[in-house]
């Protein structure tokens, strides 16, 4: 769960983070019944920037769904779809395999509206029973174990952001980056070089 604390007392993602980690926010969200890659940052402006569809970063999911649909049904999704008055942008979708009453699909989208994958596939009479985010832009889940935290190096993030990296203090000397981080997290521990 992505709340700092859950009203029902369930554990949250933030409960599992290392104690010495600075306060972070999620980039996007994962619904309660969704698993997989979650990016965290201590820079709220960076989080907002990366969540915007204009950034162009594709979020890719592996989906197990009950029901049947043809690839030709999925081939209409790149044009977008309107469900119950809500417009969803273009979606890439491919059937990976069919097993008993379930199908495995790979879905790619650039928006990230609440329950978007479940609603779109539901409109095709598919009931999602497992949803795993496998990538967010250039960052991939690959073999990262559940609950594992892995830092993204400053240089890697700057390369991925391209020209936008400058507005987040990622292109100048490391001292400028550290000053920006200290301003964002005044109580954070001082530590190693994030190069």
State what each model feature region is.
Residues 1-195:
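Basic, flexible Lys/Arg- and Gly-enriched helix-loop patches that mediate nucleic-acid binding at interfaces
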